[in-house]
């Protein structure tokens, strides 16, 4: 196997680089060969190596098993649904805190070093949670272990996106294809992961489901860490470079958040849409006497999203990020209103149809938000930026599920279906606040991005 360097970005005075996504707004730049959609996707294994796609997909699978696995484990072993819900929320809080921390460390010292520490810690945290829940440990111990499980969950999806940004400099269509693939992989994972938990818990036990997730994390998380595409830490900009660009852009959390605030808010709204929709669907199915089928009904949204995320690369270059964001978020709003009407009608068929339509607009918005996030962040902070977006989604899901549950219990199922429409409107507003063309930013030369052929 040989490693191939990516084209280097032109120099910029602040001592950083904005990566491939930043190249979308630069001119002039090398023209990317025009390829068909399938040919563009065919570039991905050539750039990263054939093993990268399955390794990265399986490595992210345990992440999608944590929330439902923790809920099921704690609820079953303690007999308390309330404690199970708290433990699940604690894992989400841990993820929201640990995700950006992992990303920032990966930016500084490289992904491999971070993952080689985080993966074993996550396995130990899962084992500790299983032990605590199974032996009747105090609630505080169980919740503490759940926080650690979330905090040490490897941020495979965001870190994989960082690798694609490095490998696709000056290749905007290939970058879009990579982001589309990543969103599809996420969607499939978030459908498959909970299904695996349910199957393993039914056949064996909730403990077996969580330990299976830990085993997959150990094997494929380490394989992801050791893969040649792992990005090294970026060299620290000189004092003069930081002064020229503003140290906040490279050093502080607040400085980076200021740069990527719009996509972070967009991802928060997207998470709220997911969480509130899931809760509303669960309430709908509970009213129908088939609560155990709520996951299958909600999965309809994920399948539609996975398909359209892959299709984003076929959109013309003239259909820019801001236009895509606003257009597809508007489609989300319309279809969320249809879901609201379907939820109020009591018709399962109508609800499934509305969710299928809703999912068609989710994928393109997700791809666009991650692409914009990469565009707005310096490459020296791309890991932190991507994990910020993922963490915002986790927080949004928890917020949407919490508020949705209260509305469903206090007002009714039909009212709960109004919350996804509100979240979709927030997505439109955040998209409108995005500048139509990012300010011109020069970029500096990056070290050769890893690639495997």
Describe every region a protein language model picked out.
Residues 33-96, 250, 254-299:
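Helix-loop boundary and gating motifs at the non-cytosolic
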Residues 376, 380-411:
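A late C-terminal transmembrane helix in Major Facilitator Superfamily
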Residues 145-188:
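Cytoplasmic helix-loop-helix junction between adjacent transmembrane helices
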Residues 323-369:
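C-terminal transmembrane helical hairpin of 12-TM major facilitator-type secondary transporters
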